[in-house]
């Protein structure tokens, strides 16, 4: 242990002295000779040998003889089981199944593998022999009062030949007699369940309550919940020491692992798995394993892409001993004692990849061979030899070098209007921040025709005749052509756009919903479990004592009035302003906003921060009777222009700045990447006629607003993001903005018989992005370019966001 600490400490000191000098300004993300650069400067340098498996592996199990490993893969595309030969280190079977979500366990002799059926509300029973899986049977967990179960964790009870399953929709524990195919007992611990394990004496079962920040202790003698034990937020995977004295559980929302004394049923220690003890949340520890003698605990930090190692030989005195770099979003880790190796399931794989087979609107296709960004990320299994002290030191140095906030240097900036780093003072010149969130456009779709930017005009769908205000704004102010949405779809998009983070619940459940495998859209205040512990930008504003006004973000509707979906939003949400509803024009939203704005101005009570939702650029496709695609885009564009004009002609203009983003890019066409998107910054202190090629992300926007308002960073992502400073000037230009009236009819309706009209009728447009995006983009393309048009093949790097 002392050797580990000395080596690691020395390497950290060296890194601190040299890293700033070695950082290079690399313009674009992608794979280099030595690492993969992600959009915000984080790097991937995965250790060991890496084997391709299915999409988004969620769990990992291996046989006692260490010949085989099996992963459950629960991505947006195919759900599957991957069987890996650990002698040859190859995937030997990929069994596609209808639905699965995490749960895996063997029976006593490993002849049967039990697999969670997710929202099918069943457990699959597969025979397993010589590395091959075959479906044998299934166990139906539904009872008369269950509408939806959603099976998550599983464990086998050898003494009774029972199966214990837990769920995240019915929030229940199911004890099942396998031989009799009979549900013996159903227990209700009170919140969403993630994992279930038995102690070694088979006296108790323990269930991590994902949404409850507790562990449920189940007495296996009377099959009752004996007590609930408090731990950290979003408890996920658990381990119990061989002597049944300590339970370890990862807290995904807290950068931590809770250690529970099972004799006293109390948390006695909390281990911080982040690289630095004082950094914000965002590491997302979600899986753990022991080494052979249980002296070392290994923790998989999903959003940091590394394993954290701790010496736990002395209870209550755990010590960090190093880190191991792994792949993208590690979701499971296991230790092979016979081989002294580690197995790591990487949810997003290893590298960004090209997307030459992206959707080609204009061609008839079943989409089976197309690549969609939500299913481009093939998982991998890393096989890593357990490192000695020297190797662990080298790995640790690599992890530190991969991490921007450790190597953070003060941004170079000539301007003095916005602080360059987080402090509590904020900007002395800018007092009012307006944040406008729109829906789902790529850079090339809207601005690809602007010659001074890095655009592809052949991919531009909405030229200046449709989006005259967008074009005028980026010509008058600054054009940003290297901005990337942190998110994939609206589920995580509205979280990344407001929290610089999407919780592990959001990341692990949106592929289920968007893959058509059940679930509900509950990521905008619909369920408490979806919220990050670090909160949202409005929490920071309110906690700072600043005023805030919310228009349409995270709201729910009742009898024509809109209220905040979260308690803290209720008093600051304008009840007349609609949320996401494509039947309501953005022109109406502008009218409602303007009435409130003018009233606030008249009272000299304009809030420091306003969040305004403008969703019409999502469009309704070619649904008969709905506004045409161009009409909805133009409606959105004009509303944006009118908002900018109204602010610029107010007495608050000199002290104002406006940020405009798309929550995600909807997998649209873009010659750089499907996540490159439209971002605008507007105000007197924004440079005019300037082009900023700096790489920015959604988290960059949040960080810049934090710097202006004197707020603290919410997560590691806004902490390490590049602030938008290159386009800021000390010399204000108070010229106001005149909006450009639409050049097309905003009331134009889709006629019958348009390409995709019938499919648009069938699509769920009541919920953000609850449509098959490949098909929806094809409809958009043909509606604009013509029914016979064909999008030429493009290459798109397929990174999802900053680090994941």
Language-model segments: which ranges?
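Predominantly soluble domains enriched in secretory-pathway, periplasmic, or organellar proteins
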Residues: 12, 17-418
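N-terminal pro-sequences and low-complexity stem/linker regions of secreted or lumenal proteins
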Residues: 393-804
